[in-house]
A protein has these predicted regions:
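CBM-like carbohydrate-recognition segments
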Residues: 20-36, 42, 47-122
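Single conserved hydrophobic/aromatic residue that forms the stacking wall/gate
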Residues: 1-5, 9
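Interfacial loop at the N-terminal end of multi-pass membrane proteins
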Residues: 13-18
């Protein structure tokens, strides 16, 4: 299924409905940034919102840690994550490993580790 953002591009005519990148859209880089940001946001709020942000970040990290997104050691150009995207509208860096995806993935994992050890995440 396509994301809400890609649906907007379809309606605006920027992509055809048969564009393979839209039909099979995945972006580990956006997911890793989001997971890290949600963990940071969880440190600023309480109770229900904290729980929602933390649980959502953990769902994302679990998905990114699966064989679908995490590369085998020594493969994928030695990047950690597969299936990142730089710029769909420009057809640039689509479904490739990106260093900033790995960076934010590791940042999110470190933040989560600090959180479960009752240390400040920042």
């Amino acid at each position: 299924p396509s994301s809400a953002a890609s649906d907007v591009y379809k309606r605006q005519g920027k992509f055809s409905k048969t564009n393979k990148y839209i039909q099979n859209y995945r972006d580990a880089s956006a997911a890793s940034v989001t997971a890290s940001a949600l963990l940071e946001l969880s440190s600023y709020v309480k109770d229900d919102k904290k729980k929602i942000y933390t649980e959502t970040a953990l769902q994302i990290l679990t998905s990114l840690s699966s064989p679908e997104y995490r590369a085998e050691e020594g493969k994928n150009g030695n990047f950690i994550l597969k299936h990142s995207t730089g710029a769909i509208p420009h057809g640039s860096e689509v479904d490739v490993p990106l260093i900033y995806a790995d960076y934010y993935f590791l940042e999110a994992l470190l933040r989560y580790n600090r959180m479960i050890n009752n240390k400040p995440i920042l």
